[in-house]
């Protein structure tokens, strides 16, 4: 179920080669490129720059999944998950997340970004910016 959820959300496969390739996420035109995170979060061309997500980022492979619509995910029973799940891109969530019953988990979760409600407020974790990337 988790694999189907990640595949349907991102509609693409991000391999190690795609991440480290010359034009991948950390390659010559990726996050560490001159117009990406390499110049800092609040630099003129960083993620907090022009369009909040880097002015030229969409043209070089940093883009949302592009899906539209609304969906519900229901899980009944046990869902054993082991290993590491790496997600690159944006996860647009608008609405509420609700859990019923006991949810036992071990490990760590890191969530960064800004809300999708349109208020323009970030999570406020510092770094000189209301956004944490």
UniProtKB/Swiss-Prot annotation:
Belongs to the chorion protein family. This protein is one of many from the eggshell of the gypsy moth. The lineage of its organism: Eukaryota, Metazoa, Ecdysozoa, Arthropoda, Hexapoda. Keywords: Repeat. GO terms for molecular function: structural constituent of egg chorion. Pfam families: Chorion_1 (PF01723). This is Chorion class A proteins Ld24. GO terms for cellular component: egg chorion. It comes from Lymantria dispar. GO terms for biological process: chorion-containing eggshell formation.
């Amino acid at each position: 179920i988790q694999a189907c959820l990640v595949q349907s959300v991102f509609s693409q496969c991000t391999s190690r080669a795609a991440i480290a390739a010359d034009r991948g996420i950390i390659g010559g035109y990726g996050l560490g490129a001159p117009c990406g995170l390499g110049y800092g979060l609040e630099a003129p061309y960083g993620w907090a720059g022009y369009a909040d997500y880097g002015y030229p980022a969409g043209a070089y492979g940093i883009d949302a999944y592009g899906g539209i619509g609304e969906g519900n995910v229901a899980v009944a029973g046990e869902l054993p998950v082991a290993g590491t799940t790496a997600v690159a891109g944006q996860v647009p969530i608008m609405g509420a997340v609700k859990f019923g019953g006991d949810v036992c988990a071990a490990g760590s979760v890191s969530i960064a970004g800004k809300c999708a409600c349109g208020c323009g407020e970030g999570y406020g974790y510092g770094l000189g910016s209301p956004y944490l990337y």
